């Protein structure tokens, strides 16, 4: 995931989860109910800290404010692919010229590349690849437009109530929005999948191209790069 002031980052812990949007830092922590703990100081415009098991809200700041979710959108893309494709992720993906035309950040796929859908998904999460997100959308649902509809259905199933996803990558688009509460609910829902947990935690990944030399990439998430506790 991209960790820039104009984008959003995600960091998960097993039991405690915090989601913040746009210019925020997201981190996992533990909470003791036996003693008073002062509310954390945060520069994020919107923040939610929840227990990922019980969905109890432990801390909130503007939890339902509409925000642009930026690259956290790819979390929904991953979850939607897992929900819809299940065990069919070993199929070779078709790479379109439209997918390769996306603005950065990108995984670097090319038309004609031979790579499984799972390989594209993994690369999408590690490199925050906008091109890979489009490849996922087109191969899962036939088009970006159809995939966006599927994203919204999956997000609602996960508990999101105030989100509209119009693309799989998170590039700015009018009407594409979410909230800190919704992203927290979506992330907590996704954590039930082992594959989801694995793919949001990778530091390095060797992209398994079958038609050219596999390429090793590193995550754009500086929390994972710097071994921040709970980031993986």
Residue ranges and their predicted role:
Residues 161, 172-232:
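Domain-terminus/edge residues, biased toward the C-terminal soluble/receptor-binding domains
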Residues 1-11:
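N-terminal secretory signal peptides that target proteins for export/translocation
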Residues 16-27:
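Bacterial N-terminal signal peptides
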Residues 33-181, 185-194:
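Active-site-adjacent loops and short helices of periplasmic peptidoglycan-processing enzymes
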Residues 30:
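Phosphodiester-processing cores and adjacent nucleic acid-binding clamps
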